[in-house]
Amino acid sequence: MAAVAPAGPGDSASAALDELSLNFTYGAPGAGNGSLSGDWYRRNQIHLFGVLLAILGNLVISISLNIQKYSHLQLAQQEHPRPYFKSVLWWGGVLLMAVGETGNFAAYGFAPITLIAPLGCVSVTGSAIISVTFLKDNLRASDLLGTTLAFAGTYLLVNFAPNITQAISARTVQYYLVGWQFLIYVILEILIFCILLYFYKRKGMKHMVILLTLVAILASLTVISVKAVSGMITFSVMDKMQLTYPIFYIMFIIMIASCVFQVKFLNQATKLYNTTTVVPVNHIFFTISAIIAGIIFYQEFLGAPFLTVFIYLFGCFLSFLGVFLVTRNREKEHLQQSYIDFGNIPGKQMLDKIQPDSHSLSYGTLPDGSDSTKSQSGEKKEV
């Protein structure tokens, strides 16, 4: 069924409901049942284009995160470390992230949130490979198994996501925005965000879960606003101009603001923790947040068969399990500093250990719990 705008002002609530009912188009029975026939491809060409944009965008994002991490490592090893925002390399990573996010945002205009959001698992694989290549992380057997499970989950997600085409107009967004489901949802998000922000700012708690939960809460607003903005632009091109409605610019401002603060918290996480841990955990949190946002705000599972929903959730489970296998037992990154250990010289007694002082060009002793009187002069102890 094609999307039809209400003819007159009349009863606005009733008109909005009528428009919503016309804005949903589900595939025929059997469509979206996992079959990869030629008919399936023809029916889902627009969705597949969105999937391609999302995959490419996530690969670029994984590259950008590793570049930012490499920038932090370089700055930390300098004699006089500079702020990260003065690093050209760091800004290059931010620019790449913007490109990747642009591809992701565009993807939401061609496919449902519940289809695009879980595809962030592609960045897990990309991040692991890039970290092994450039940051010298170890590639383990569990990484390969996790990657395989992530791809299996992606296959199920693409084939069993709701086969829905939804026309997003300004009236539709306005109706969703004042719905009781979304109002309850956004109030809960604001409360959780304020509590976490209090612990982060006032208590100095910078645990990765706190940082990435803040990112995920902002991300839910991002995907809602991105879907609204891109949907209204598409509706303007295909049907009736929507850019004259104030709601378009309200959603645009929400999109920009939420993106800016996401970058702030995500950058803090990548500075403190290994990207091979940050990226996958961020994927899990973001995916859950985005799926909930799509279900509550855009009602993307409305009328979907139970089997489709079950297999879709199973695909999410496989994706998350793959992410867990990739991230488990990852040690926090430590800066590699050169030091000399006299005890490692064959036939020599251990006299002392010395290493470069991280903040000067001089040499000093490594701390030793058995002797708290070591001097920075490197003098030998009597044996």
Curated annotation (Swiss-Prot):
Residue ranges of the TM segments: 46-66, 88-108, 110-130, 144-164, 177-197, 209-229, 243-263, 278-298, 306-326
Keyword set, alphabetical order: Glycoprotein, Membrane, Transmembrane, Transmembrane helix
Residues covered by region (Disordered): 355-383
Glycosylated residues, chain numbering: 23, 33, 274
Superkingdom per UniProt: Eukaryota
First-listed, main subcellular location of the protein, grouped into a coarse class: membrane
Keyword DNA damage: no
GO CC, one annotated term: membrane
A GO molecular-function descriptor: magnesium ion transmembrane transporter activity
InterPro entries according to UniProt: Mg_trans_NIPA (IPR008521)
Entry's localization field: Membrane
A Pfam family of this chain: Mg_trans_NIPA
Topology in the lipid bilayer: Multi-pass membrane protein
Biological processes annotated in GO: magnesium ion transport
Family per record: Belongs to the NIPA family.
This protein's name: NIPA-like protein 2
Lineage: Eukaryota, Metazoa, Chordata, Craniata, Vertebrata
